Amino acid sequence: GKDMKICTFYNHCSHRGNLLAMEPSGTAKRITCMFHQWAYDTKGNCVEITRQKEGYQDRISKKDMGLREVKTEVGLGGFVWVNVDDNCGPLKDFVGDTLDYLKDELSTKPLEIISYHKSVVNSNYKLWYDTNSELYHDFLHHHNRKIALIQPGYWERRVHTHDYGHISVDSMECRYDAYEGNDGQQRQLGWPGGEVACHKLIDMFPTMTFILRSPAFRLDTMVPLGPDKVIIEFRGFAIKGDSAKDRDARVRDHNSIWGPFGRNLPEDEIAIVGQMMAMKNGDDSTYILHGREEPSIQNEIGMRHYYGEWSKWMERPASDPFGNRAIAAAE
């Protein structure tokens, strides 16, 4: 709006519930519903009801027909955070100290999106989160098996748990010079506030992942469509005001290695689709084992921490969500 404050509303008309905005972005001063031409301003106020007096007399008023607003905060890296729960607590309480690990990288200079793509994956959203939360599956990835697992410092890293199910992973150096097609060249372009060629990871419960592999940075978010389908959205970021040379380098590494044309993402997607196919059979494969406990990066504490938080929100144990143990005991 004119006051430069970001507001968020449900994207449907107060009249018949029709979709209002058809595009992901724009500069309209007001939004008009195509169905019956009801209109709203940037504050969500209803400013036009066609033939209001003739059809409704004095039974409704525009001031009562505004759009439904939801909680919105801007911060923690300059991102817009939205929560549809009217009774949710402050954002800072939920995030806690989790993003401190990337505080400098997210706040030193403004960011802008350089890449966006999404996948509709036939799997459960928690299985995707699993691939970002445990490093035991580095054995899945062609590049990680050949490069990451043998790098100095790989095994010394640890997974750190935070309140509300979030985790962070210790940093390590990305060895770009060992990747096929890079002509043995290590990256010299870093990230403001961070190191050159560093790898940092934060998973935020329940559906968000921050991955910095300088010079590239990616943010993953999920929208579950059901128990066996999820939309995963991937956004690549660069530094606003980059030189043309630096921008080209960030785009190249993001898109060709860590983004849509790399190997890691398709390999992860193939794995979780395979899991879902097996689990839907209804046989004994409908469980997940997160039992690794070892003093290394491949400790599976991240997902145990996640499912512990999931159990609190769902008010049922993740290990027995349908209460089958109690039924069996009663029998």
Model-derived regions: residue spans:
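Rieske [2Fe-2S] iron-sulfur-binding domain
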Residues: G1-D86, K92-G96
